[in-house]
Amino acid sequence: MPRPAVFLDRDGVLNQEVGYIHRLEDLQLIPGVAQAVRRLNDAGWFCCLASNQSGPARDYYSIDHVHALHHRLQELLAASAGAVLDAVYFCPDLSRPEGGVVADYAGWTTWRKPNTGMLVAAAWDHDLDLSRSVMVGDKATDIDLARNAGCYGILVQTGFGDRVLEGSYQHASQPDYIAEDLAAAVEWICTHLAPR
């Protein structure tokens, strides 16, 4: 039977929002994030990273660098609280009008948020029920992705979340819940939704 998942954006949700991360050591967890992910692990949720990462398309760094950043993220989560991301999905693509310059990644794709490609692929790969799943992010595109995929959408106020709420970043979105940070989002998830 398909199970639900918690999909997590990366920058501004799990790690500090510092723009494009060129050095591995600049990827730093937001305080309390590892414990929040561990709580989801312990409660039986499938935890999956779902993140737009256009650095390779913009020619800022290689796809291998993105993989190294995700390896560091997993190491920090494990070292801090024994937390685990069960799967990692990301979109390195960006269309040319949006700034994509590297031919291999400069195009439109169903994987780039708010399109549903990453979540549909994860659902297929891991037998997930999107209608009972949650997308947690700090941008309007995360909430739009949740709507497009039929998931619950939680906007965290870390990263760009406050600017989304003010209407000064992207467009107004209507999340199912607004949380101060990932720990508060996980509290809401564990109180209102069941992982099975």
Curated annotation (Swiss-Prot):
Binding site for Mg(2+): 9, 11, 138-139
Domain of life: Bacteria
Gene Ontology biological-process annotations: carbohydrate metabolic process
Catalytic activity from the UniProt record: D-glycero-D-manno-heptose 1,7-bisphosphate + H2O = D-glycero-D-manno-heptose 1-phosphate + phosphate
Site positions (Contributes to substrate recognition): 112
GO cellular component, one term: cytoplasm
Keyword Hydrolase found: yes
EC number: 3.1.3.-
Gene3D superfamilies reported for this sequence: HAD superfamily/HAD-like
Locations listed in the record: Cytoplasm
Single GO molecular function: zinc ion binding
Residues flagged as site, Stabilizes the phosphoryl group: 51, 113
Reported cofactor(s): Mg(2+); Zn(2+)
Keyword field contains Hydrolase: yes
Main location: cytoplasm
Quaternary context: Monomer.
PANTHER family: D-GLYCERO-BETA-D-MANNO-HEPTOSE-1,7-BISPHOSPHATE 7-PHOSPHATASE (PTHR42891:SF1)
Designated name of the protein: D-glycero-D-manno-heptose-1,7-bisphosphate 7-phosphatase
Annotated source species: Thermosynechococcus vestitus (strain NIES-2133 / IAM M-273 / BP-1)
Gene name as annotated: gmhB
